[in-house]
Amino acid sequence: MRRILVLNGPNINMLGTREKAIYGRRDYDSLCAYIRSAAARLGVEGELLQSNYEGDIVTAIQKAYGAFDGIVINPAAFTHYSVAILDALKAVNIPAIEVHISNIHQREEFRHHSVTVAGCIGQICGLGFAGYALALEALAVYEPEA
């Protein structure tokens, strides 16, 4: 059974409260339940972590080395400037997919660029909670080309 680490960055714990027009009314507990259900359906083991602290996310990525087969990451605001998260993703060389609930390319200009995606095999954005399920599904079957 593949093990997938699901990381959520700052303010994702505030789902259901913050900017409902962008993120919807479902809360973080609903997201976690959705992810767990998708993981079970796909036959993968999913472990979830949310942190508002960049260093905690870097540490979680580093600890994933040798323990996880894939990473689903929503770096949230760290997406746009965290070279530390990018470097951690590159260091562990675990297939990772960046996920965003909203479409970052349809929002403010500063959100259009992702620094962290360069450490990922792909990006899914704008599909709400379903983006997490799609990322899990992709990692469940992913085989590196080389």
Go through each PLM region and give its residues.
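Extreme N-terminal starter segment of soluble prokaryotic enzymes
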Residues: 1-4
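Short glycine-rich anion-binding loops that position phosphate/pyrophosphate groups of nucleotides
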Residues: 10-12, 76-79, 102-104
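Glycine- and acidic-residue-enriched helix-capping/strand-helix junction motifs
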Residues: 15-29
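Short beta->alpha junction loops
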Residues: 47-55
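Short Gly/Thr/Asp-enriched flexible loops that form oxyanion-binding sites at enzyme active sites
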Residues: 63, 82-91
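Short acidic/histidine-rich motifs immediately flanking catalytic phosphotransfer sites
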Residues: 64-71
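Short, acidic/small-residue loops that bind anionic groups at enzyme active sites
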Residues: 90-107
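Short, glycine-/small-residue-rich phosphate/pyrophosphate-handling segment
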Residues: 105-146
